[in-house]
Amino acid sequence: MMVDPLYKGGLTKPLCSSGLRPITDSCVVIPNFDNSVRSIIVVNILVFAGILYSQFRNTLSIFSLWCPNTRAVFLFICPCLLYFYQGIFSTDEQIGTFNIIWMLRRLTIELIIRNLNAEKER
């Protein structure tokens, strides 16, 4: 049972079992996101973890075969992936879940700027 101060039928009402249904007098709606949204959130978090890892470790052996400036390439690709994945899967009902991803984007852009400034100073 969950307390709902706006509910006029009593102090508490049960939670809805599943789905994004309209709020009725019988239950409280809990958003039930499908697997695509969960997987996109996980992908974004993993990408951001990779960005942090690349900031603290100088070795990225996969990318070093392709380009000498590996960290700049890696930090350019990751935000593009963030925008690509969220652009496909975001809807009006799910936009609240992506607040964490917006924060990760800001941090990603900050890391890119710091990385590029550090490389200019070298």
UniProtKB/Swiss-Prot annotation:
Localisation: Membrane
Instruction: Report the membrane topology from the UniProt record.
Output: Multi-pass membrane protein
Name where it mostly resides: membrane
> Has the keyword RNA-binding been applied to this entry?
no
Identify this protein by name.
Putative uncharacterized protein YFR056C
Any idea which UniProt keywords this protein has? Membrane, Transmembrane, Transmembrane helix
Q: Give induction info.
A: Silenced by SIR3.
Taxonomy, superkingdom: Eukaryota
Instruction: Print the miscellaneous field.
Output: Partially overlaps YFR055W.
Where are the membrane-spanning stretches?
36-56, 72-92
The keyword Transmembrane helix appears for this protein: yes
List the signal peptide residues. none
Gene Ontology cellular component annotations, sorted alphabetically? membrane
